[in-house]
Structure formats: structure tokens, C-alpha cells
């Protein structure tokens, strides 16, 4: 069976960037496990804050964590009390100085992670999955998305047999590397079992060399024979010419037949 490559991992280094930015030689595995631990702690503490993604950068003895959220007020807390508590917890678990940055997301309807979490939360509250998917697609397209695709799989509406439901609008070119596609996968835990929610959002094309400018395709140059231009080379042959050659060949064969009879 065919499998789809991860849209973000497929574009890393081209139009997408890594969410962990550091280099290590000997203690690579330790730092990798530390990154996983930091992400789990932040996701647990900020479960209801609408966290879309977490970026981690490292220096010698310092860790810089950037949290992109749709609800910065919940993350920061009253007079910054909650963010200070979170920073202290991260420093205690890592034993390093942690710098915590909070970035606000102004259009959460175009973030695949937040859209998937919203659909999963509605499914947990027994909202119709069809309605949740359709509303999410409509909101994303209304705010400028060029294409949206949502997939829900599992025992939908408590059915005896698991099935897959799709909702889509616009186009989502998965094989175009310059296509800016956001992707997320979330699970909804219901009394009937676990339901998977996948979201693809196509935001337009991004050109690595000239961002913000549309690059027109270069005209193709065909190889022509000496003495002929490209237009003459690509001009199709007339049907009459082929018919004429066929008639001449038939006449030649007929002439040979006449000589054999004599």
C-alpha cells in the first residue's frame, strides 16, 4: 500500500525549519531526551492554552524555548506569575538557565495543530464530527487558506465498524516542495475508543530564493535541427503528406508488380 510522507519533514531545509536548533557530538542522545522532556512538560502545563508549536535553541549552558500560542494571556498569567513558575520548573528539571519566549498566533484557524485539537475536543464533547470538520474547513478558507483537507478515522459516532471520513476544499499539492503545507495529527479519546484527526492546510507557495515574489517558469527551449527554428521543428506534419507518401509507395509496388507480369 502507498504511504504519504510527512509534509513538514519532507520540506525541512527547503522552506521549513527545524523546531530544535542545536548541534552536539557526544551527548546528542541526552539532549534529545531533554528536548522531549521539555516538550512534554510544556504541553502538560499549557494544555488549554492553544500551543501550536515549541522551538528549542541551545548554547553552552543556556536553553531558549519559544512557545507559539493562540492564548498568550493564559500562558503568561497574572503579572507573569504562571510563566515564571513554568520557567522555574524547566530550570529545575534541566539544571540549566532557561529563557522562555511567548509568541502570539493571530490566526489560529490557519494552524493545523490548533485546528486538529479543536476538532478532537468537539468530538470528545459529542459534537457531530461532520459539523466540526465542515466548520473548520470553512473558517480556514475564509481566512485565506488555498486548500484544506481533514481526515477523521475510527469508530465515528459510536459505529460498530471503524471507518474514515474526509472533508476538503481547495487544493493541497503534497508533492510540490515549495507549497507551504501545515500538518498535524491529534487523537480524540472517546468512550468508544480512540479517533484519529489529521489536518492539512495549504497556505500558498514559498520561494526560498525570492520570498514574497512570484517566480514565473522559464520558457522551455527545444533542440532544433540545423537550419530550422524551434517553431519549424515543433510544427506537426500534415496528413496529406503522409497520404502522398503512401500513394507513391503503392504506385511503386504496383509498378514492380507490372514488370513481373511481363
From Swiss-Prot:
CDD domains: KH-II_30S_S3 (cd02412). InterPro entries: KH_dom (IPR004087), KH_dom-like_a/b (IPR015946), KH_dom_type_2 (IPR004044), KH_sf_prok-type (IPR009019), Ribosomal_S3_C_sf (IPR036419), Ribosomal_uS3_bac-typ (IPR005704), Ribosomal_uS3_C (IPR001351), Ribosomal_uS3_CS (IPR018280). SMART domains: KH (SM00322). One of its GO terms (molecular function) is rRNA binding. It holds the Pfam family KH_2. It comes from the Bacteria. Keywords: Ribonucleoprotein, Ribosomal protein, RNA-binding, rRNA-binding. Residues 38-106 form the KH type-2 domain. Residues 211-262 are annotated as: Disordered. One of its GO terms (cellular component) is cytosolic small ribosomal subunit. Residues 243-255 have a biased composition (Gly residues). Disulfide bonds: none annotated. GO terms for biological process: translation. Belongs to the universal ribosomal protein uS3 family. Binds the lower part of the 30S subunit head. Binds mRNA in the 70S ribosome, positioning it for translation. Part of the 30S ribosomal subunit. Forms a tight complex with proteins S10 and S14. This is Small ribosomal subunit protein uS3. It comes from Roseiflexus sp. (strain RS-1).
Amino acid at each position: 500500500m502507498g504511504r504519504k510522507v510527512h509534509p513538514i519533514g519532507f520540506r525541512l531545509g527547503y522552506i521549513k525549519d527545524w523546531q530544535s536548533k542545536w548541534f552536539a557530538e557526544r551527548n546528542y542522545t541526552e539532549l534529545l531526551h531533554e528536548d522531549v522532556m521539555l516538550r512534554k512538560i510544556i504541553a502538560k502545563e499549557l494544555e488549554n492554552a492553544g500551543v501550536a508549536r515549541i522551538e528549542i535553541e541551545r548554547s553552552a549552558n543556556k536553553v531558549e524555548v519559544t512557545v507559539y500560542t493562540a492564548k498568550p494571556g493564559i500562558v503568561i498569567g497574572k503579572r507573569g506569575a504562571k510563566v515564571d513558575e513554568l520557567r522555574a520548573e524547566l530550570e529545575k528539571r534541566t539544571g540549566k538557565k532557561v529563557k522562555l519566549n511567548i509568541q502570539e498566533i493571530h490566526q489560529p484557524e490557519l494552524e493545523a495543530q490548533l485546528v486538529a485539537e479543536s476538532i478532537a475536543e468537539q468530538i470528545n464533547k459529542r459534537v457531530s464530527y461532520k459539523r466540526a470538520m465542515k466548520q473548520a474547513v470553512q473558517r480556514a478558507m475564509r481566512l485565506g487558506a488555498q486548500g484544506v483537507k481533514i481526515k477523521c478515522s475510527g469508530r465515528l459516532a459510536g459505529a460498530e465498524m471503524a471507518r474514515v471520513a474526509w472533508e476538503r476544499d481547495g487544493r493541497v499539492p503534497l508533492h510540490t516542495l515549495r507549497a507551504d503545507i501545515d500538518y498535524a495529527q491529534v487523537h480524540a479519546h472517546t468512550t468508544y475508543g480512540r479517533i484519529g484527526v489529521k489536518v492539512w492546510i495549504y497556505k500558498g507557495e514559498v520561494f526560498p530564493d525570492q520570498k514574497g515574489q512570484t517566480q514565473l517558469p522559464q520558457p522551455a527551449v527545444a533542440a532544433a535541427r540545423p537550419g530550422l527554428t524551434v517553431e519549424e521543428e515543433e510544427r506537426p506534419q500534415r496528413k496529406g503528406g503522409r497520404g502522398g507518401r503512401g500513394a507513391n509507395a503503392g504506385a511503386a509496388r504496383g509498378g514492380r508488380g507490372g514488370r513481373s507480369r511481363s
